[in-house]
Regions:
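Outer-membrane beta-barrel transmembrane domain signature
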Residues: 121, 185-196, 376, 391-416, ...
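Aromatic- and glycine-enriched pocket-lining scaffold segments that form the walls
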Residues: 147-262
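Transmembrane beta-barrel strands of outer-membrane/channel proteins
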Residues: 32-40, 82-88, 131-137, 172-176, ...
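Surface-exposed loop and membrane-interface regions of Gram-negative outer-membrane beta-barrel proteins
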Residues: 39-125, 137-150, 183-185, 193-203, ...
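Beta-barrel outer-membrane channel/assembly domains of diderm bacteria
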Residues: 2-4, 8-127, 131, 161-170, ...
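Detector for outer-membrane/organellar transmembrane beta-barrel domains
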Residues: 219-417, 421
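Outer-membrane beta-barrel architecture
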Residues: 67-69, 116-118, 159-161, 211-217, ...
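Residues that define the transmembrane beta-barrel architecture of outer-membrane proteins
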Residues: 26, 54, 58-64, 108-113, ...
Length: 488
C-alpha cells in the first residue's frame, strides 16, 4: 500500500505542476484500423498474396490497430504531443487465442508499432516544422486496393518533418531496425540456427539496418505535386558474433540505396499517382513486391540493382460509377550468381532427389488490378475487382558439377464480386465497410510453381501444423465470405 501511495502522490504532483509549465489541459485522441470476418478460404493460409492480387475477397485474418495520443502541452504557438499504437493479428478462426508463443499455429500476435514524441511550432521562423523521436510509422507509401506498402522504413528513429525550403517541404530522418540473425533461409522458409550451424559462413548476417532518409515535396502545376526521395541503408553487424563465428570481410552484407521520383496529379473527378523507384545494393530485393526495408542477408545482392514502376489512382466517371486501378512493373539483376566461385552464396534445393545449388541472377514482375464500383443506394454499392500478376526468377543452378540456367515462374489471377455496405456508398474511402463477396482464384499452388528447376514436377507442401499434401502446378479455388473494415 505504501508503494501505491507514493506512486499516487507522484502522479498528482506531476498533474498539478504540468499546467503550471504549459498552461494547458491535455486532450486525448483515439484512432485505429481494424478488419475481421469469415471466409471459406483454407484456414492454414497465413498471409495471402494481397500485394499481387488485391485485398478484396482475399483476406483471411483478423487484424487491428489501436492508437492513443494526446497533446500534452502548448507553449506559445508550439504543441507537444505523444502518440502510441499497438497491433493485433490472428490467422485462425478460434474463439480463444492467446498471445502465448508456445504454439505458433494457434496463438495471436501483438506488436508495439508506435510510441513517439513530437513538437510542432518549435521554430519561430517555420511553424509547420515538426521535430520527432521514438518508434513510428514513417512516410509510408501504399496502394490501397493491394494492401501493399511499397515504401515503408518504419521503425525507431528521429527526424524533422515539413521544413520549409523554397516552394516545398523537406523531411529528414534517421530510422533503425534491428535484426536477429540467428537464422537462415532455406528454399521455402526461415530456419533457426543451432550454435554449430552458425559456423556456416555463407550466412553472415547483420545486427541492424540504419535508414538515412530525405524527402522533398513541392508543387509543380495546378493540382499536382512532385516527391523526390532518397534512402541510404547502412547494415551494421554485431561485432562480437561476427568474430565469434569466424566471419571475414567477404561475408559482409553491403549497404543499399533507394531513390524515388513520384508525381501526384489531382483531377476534378479523381487522382493519379506515378512513381519510379531505383534500388541498388543489398536491398534490391524490395524491387519484387517489397517495402524498401528488406535486406538480403546472404550478401548475394551487394552488387544488385533494380527498377520499379507504379501507377495507381481513382477516377469517378459518373456520380455513381468509378474505377480504381494499380499497375506495377519491376526488374532487377546483378546478383552474385557465380556458382563456381569460392565466395558463392546459394540455396540447396528442397527436393532431395534433385538436390543442387541455385542462385538468383535476375528477376522481373508485372501486376495489374482494376477495381470498378457502382453505387446502388445511399449506403450500398457493387464492387468488381479483377487482377493478374506474374513473376519470373532467372536462376543459375549447379548439380553434380553441371551448371545450367533456368527460370522459375509464378502467376495468378483473381476475380471478385462484392456487395458493400458503408455509411456513404458514393465515397470509396467511406468506412466502416461490410463486404459480402465471392472470389475466383487461379494461381500456382501455394504461390510456387514446382514444374521448373531440376525437373521437380511435383513436391510436397508441409503446412505449419504438419499437414501435408502433394502440390500441383495450377490451382483453382472459389472463396466466399463476409469481411468488415474500418479506420478512425
Amino acid at each position: 500500500m505504501k508503494k501505491v501511495n507514493l506512486l499516487l502522490a507522484a502522479v498528482v504532483a506531476a498533474s498539478v505542476s504540468a499546467p503550471a509549465l504549459a498552461e494547458y489541459t491535455p486532450n486525448a485522441h483515439f484512432y485505429g484500423f481494424a478488419r475481421a470476418g469469415v471466409s471459406s478460404q483454407h484456414y492454414n493460409v497465413d498471409d495471402p498474396e494481397k500485394a499481387r492480387l488485391g485485398r478484396l475477397g482475399y483476406e483471411s485474418d483478423i487484424y487491428g490497430e489501436v492508437g492513443l495520443g494526446t497533446t500534452v502541452a502548448k507553449v506559445d504557438d508550439s504543441e507537444w504531443n505523444i502518440n502510441s499504437r499497438v497491433a493485433y493479428k490472428s490467422t485462425l478462426n478460434k474463439d480463444w487465442q492467446t498471445a502465448d508463443n508456445t504454439n505458433s499455429t494457434e496463438h495471436a500476435n501483438f506488436a508495439f508499432r508506435e510510441l513517439y514524441f513530437d513538437v510542432k511550432g518549435f521554430f519561430d521562423s517555420d511553424k509547420d516544422a515538426v521535430i520527432w523521436a521514438g518508434k513510428r510509422y514513417y512516410h509510408r507509401e501504399d496502394i490501397y486496393i493491394n494492401d501493399w506498402r511499397y515504401y515503408d522504413i518504419s521503425g525507431m528513429g528521429t527526424g524533422i518533418e515539413n521544413l520549409s525550403l523554397g516552394s516545398g517541404k523537406l523531411s529528414l530522418a534517421w530510422i533503425r531496425r534491428d535484426e536477429n540473425r540467428d537464422y537462415k533461409w532455406d528454399e521455402t522458409s526461415k530456419v533457426v540456427l543451432e550454435d554449430d550451424e552458425k559456423l556456416d559462413k555463407t550466412y553472415s548476417g547483420y545486427g541492424a539496418v540504419h535508414f538515412l532518409d530525405a524527402q522533398y515535396d513541392f508543387p509543380v502545376w495546378d493540382k499536382a505535386s512532385m516527391e523526390l526521395r532518397a534512402t541510404y541503408m547502412i547494415n551494421q553487424h554485431d561485432n562480437a558474433k561476427f568474430l565469434q563465428y569466424g566471419y571475414v570481410a567477404k561475408n559482409e552484407v553491403g549497404n543499399g540505396t533507394r531513390f524515388e521520383v513520384k508525381l501526384n496529379q489531382g483531377f476534378s473527378s479523381g487522382w493519379n499517382t506515378t512513381a519510379v523507384i531505383f534500388d541498388f545494393g543489398s536491398h534490391t530485393g524490395s524491387a519484387g513486391f517489397g517495402t524498401g526495408s528488406w535486406c538480403d542477408s546472404s550478401g548475394a545482392a551487394n552488387s544488385a540493382h533494380g527498377i520499379s514502376l507504379f501507377n495507381y489512382g481513382d477516377f469517378k466517371i459518373t456520380d455513381r460509377f468509378g474505377i480504381m486501378h494499380s499497375i506495377y512493373f519491376a526488374r532487377s539483376g546483378g546478383y552474385d550468381d557465380n556458382v563456381n566461385g569460392e565466395n558463392f552464396i546459394g540455396k540447396v534445393l528442397a527436393d532431395e532427389e534433385n538436390k543442387g545449388v541455385t542462385a538468383n541472377s535476375g528477376y522481373k514482375a508485372f501486376m495489374f488490378a482494376i477495381h470498378p464500383y457502382y453505387q446502388l443506394t445511399k449506403m450500398t454499392k457493387l464492387v468488381l475487382e479483377g487482377s493478374f500478376y506474374t513473376e519470373t526468377w532467372s536462376k543459375v543452378g549447379k548439380k553434380d558439377g553441371v551448371v545450367k540456367n533456368f527460370d522459375e515462374n509464378q502467376k495468378g489471377q483473381k476475380l471478385t464480386l462484392a456487395y458493400v455496405l458503408s455509411p456513404d456508398a458514393s465515397n470509396i474511402w467511406s468506412k466502416p465497410e461490410i463486404r459480402l463477396f465471392a472470389t475466383y482464384l487461379h494461381s500456382n499452388e501455394n504461390g510456387i510453381d514446382f514444374s521448373n528447376g531440376f525437373g521437380a514436377k511435383e513436391a510436397t507442401i508441409v503446412y505449419k501444423n504438419g499437414y501435408e499434401r502433394e502440390a500441383t502446378k495450377n490451382h483453382n479455388n472459389v472463396i466466399f465470405g463476409v469481411y468488415g473494415e474500418a479506420w478512425w
